[in-house]
């Protein structure tokens, strides 16, 4: 069995907020830091409210993520979805959101 250790996104750079799950403004810099560690991955996340600045939501952003992942020799992407924490799973809007997220993740 192979055990992997990673870190949640936003823990390797400073944020201007006391919010625990705040998407980092300069997310790509975290890959520079992870190269200096023996960590296996950075766990991306979505926030409780839709954040269009998160690169997971655009094809161009996904290309940037893939490029950064390959530069640190990581082979996979791990995502934690926080949107469903504050949005009911039985709502149509949440269903649409989750379908969009799944469609975006298929680009990896």
Q: Which residues make up each language-model segment?
A:
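N-terminal pre-domain/capping segments
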Residues: 1-106
